[in-house]
Amino acid sequence: METESGNQEKVMEEESTEKKKEVEKKKRSRVKQVLADIAKQVDFWFGDANLHKDRFLREQIEKSRDGYVDISLLVSFNKMKKLTTDGKLIARALRSSAVVELDLEGTRIRRKKPLGERPKDEDERTVYVELLPKNVNHSWIERVFGKCGNVVYISIPHYKSTGDPKGFAFVEFETKEQAAKAIEFLNNPPEEAPRKPGIFPKTVKNKPIPALRVVEEKKKKKKKKGRMKKEDNIQAKEENMDTSNTSISKMKRSRPTSEGSDIESTEPQKQCSKKKKKRDRVEASSLPEVRTGKRKRSSSEDAESLAPRSKVKKIIQKDIIKEASEASKENRDIEISTEEEKDTGDLKDSSLLKTKRKHKKKHKERHKMGEEVIPLRVLSKSEWMDLKKEYLALQKASMASLKKTISQIKSESEMETDSGVPQNTGMKNEKTANREECRTQEKVNATGPQFVSGVIVKIISTEPLPGRKQVRDTLAAISEVLYVDLLEGDTECHARFKTPEDAQAVINAYTEINKKHCWKLEILSGDHEQRYWQKILVDRQAKLNQPREKKRGTEKLITKAEKIRLAKTQQASKHIRFSEYD
């Protein structure tokens, strides 16, 4: 009994050790690639090319006395978040870095060498690329341009509103020679591309950019249509194949199966069966899907049988003959090659060699497809800068002409208002009086509404009041309303009228209003009225003090031009009504 219990304990111990080993194996994590990616990313951030352009990181280094930056700052970057959020793992990855070094605690890093001055030949080493794919990223550009040399920095501008790439990028190389090589080898713009290079998109702030996804969706729809058509063609071919197979199977079934029937059959019956077989062969060869290249007679028989038929069938027959001739040529070549190989060695060895050759050819074709020419336009940055200057000069000229046209339109409109039918002195005096009244009204508006007692009516409802427009319309049917102070969902509101008489008229018409709406109406007076007038002034001041977007330069001109264009279109679209007497 003791021996049995001892054996059981040993078995249990062995099982537990095995389980521990399995757990240890599972715990082991492979982080070589992650460590390499972390080291590469941090080396780029602290490299000369990036630090000369990255103001934020440069300021963080300059703030510290020793030039150290906390690893927690790197963890806050989005690209590092994708790799890891563990500071210890980052420290482990940077131990053998050639660009940065760790402090004694392993929580901070700094550059090994101090940052020098910005190189003067930066623009000469940089190339401008356009006609990029819509979903372009840094890794794609690095893979394409890495063939020409060591890529130091990549800049892909994006739209702020949508986040889509603008369709161009800047690639900085290590040397001028590498940049020149990239311009020489990768500058292959397609025929459809515009003649002049350079994309200078100018969009108004907060204005939606024409979505690129719409174009992509259209392309996807086209692809789907193409696939559907292909599938339909394949189905049609399969149906044709099925019909041909069924016809062949029918002919096979018609043949005699028993041996007794074969002996009893006469010679004329054999001749008929031979003719039927020939017809079957002709039918099989007439189908474009089933190619029988070895049987040359079938194609000639097809030509003889299909000659008296219609023109459409003749065209089909020509295509079939072409296919048959191509297949026969291929077979001839194979026959010649097999005859030569018979002299040299066995047929099996030759077939193996042929298959190998075919595989090699396929692989070569695939490699060629992989090394296809990418349709890009590549220029030097200095050339792009010249194009940018040209574009800005054109923009300046166009804006100047737009400014002139706007001023001309304004002057013409003023002339039209002033000129017209010759006016009397009395009419002129009336005009001047009206102008003075307008000026006084403008002054009043500038100071705000003046205090008038008995003008404000308070409206109370058991349910939430309808919209401001509906309240205004119901009150305006009785007397003129200047303003309705109402927030959405409120049960109380205030209406301001022009004169106390107008407010009193609304109170008098309470019975009419109460039929449609269950409202309580009262004119404010005393302290309540004074408090409300103070509220009006405070609200007005708050509204005036709100920050406004200042439109300047090209934006201001474009908005003015748009307003003029809209006014002209509205005038043009007006319906001209003729009276009965015209």
Curated annotation (Swiss-Prot):
Domain xRRM intervals: 450-563
Database matches in InterPro entries: La_dom_prot, La_HTH, La_xRRM, LARP7_La, LARP7_RRM1, LARP7_RRM2, Lupus_La, Nucleotide-bd_a/b_plait_sf
Modified residues (N-acetylmethionine): 1
Record-level GO cellular component terms: 7SK snRNP; cytosol; nucleoplasm; nucleus; ribonucleoprotein complex
Result of changing residue 44 to A: Reduced binding to U6 snRNA without affecting binding to 7SK RNA. Reduced 2'-O-methylation of U6 snRNAs
Listed Basic and acidic residues bias regions: 10-25, 229-240, 316-335, 428-442
Location in or out of the cell: Nucleus, Nucleoplasm
Residue stretches making up the RRM domain: 125-203
Biased composition (Basic residues): 219-228, 354-367
UniProt GO MF annotations: 7SK snRNA binding; RNA binding; U6 snRNA binding
Keyword terms of this UniProt record: Acetylation, Differentiation, Disease variant, Dwarfism, Intellectual disability, Isopeptide bond, mRNA processing, mRNA splicing, Nucleus, Phosphoprotein, RNA-binding, Spermatogenesis, Transcription, Transcription regulation, Ubl conjugation
Region (Disordered): 1-27, 188-368, 410-442
Site of covalent link Glycyl lysine isopeptide (Lys-Gly) (interchain with G-Cter in SUMO2): 237, 410
Sequence ranges assigned to domain HTH La-type RNA-binding in this UniProt record: 28-122
In-chain residues carrying the UniProt-annotated modification Phosphoserine: 258, 261, 273, 298-300, 337, 351
BP GO annotations: box C/D sno(s)RNA 3'-end processing; cell differentiation; mRNA processing; negative regulation of transcription by RNA polymerase II; negative regulation of transcription elongation by RNA polymerase II; negative regulation of viral transcription; positive regulation of protein localization to Cajal body; positive regulation of snRNA transcription by RNA polymerase II
Assembly and binders: Core component of the 7SK RNP complex, at least composed of 7SK RNA, LARP7, MEPCE, HEXIM1 (or HEXIM2) and P-TEFb (composed of CDK9 and CCNT1/cyclin-T1). Interacts with METTL16. Interacts with RBM7; upon genotoxic stress this interaction is enhanced, triggering the release of inactive P-TEFb complex from the core, yielding to P-TEFb complex activation. Associates with box C/D small nucleolar ribonucleoprotein (snoRNP) complexes.
Disease: Alazami syndrome: A syndromic form of primordial dwarfism, a condition characterized by severe growth restriction that has its onset in utero, and results in short stature and undersize. ALAZS patients manifest severe intellectual disability and distinct facial features including malar hypoplasia, deep-set eyes, broad nose, short philtrum, and macrostomia. Some patients have non-specific and inconsistent skeletal findings, for example, scoliosis and mild epiphyseal changes in the proximal phalanges, but no frank dysplasia.
Entry note about domains: The xRRM domain binds the 3' end of 7SK snRNA (7SK RNA) at the top of stem-loop 4.
Protein name (Swiss-Prot/TrEMBL): La-related protein 7
Organism: Homo sapiens
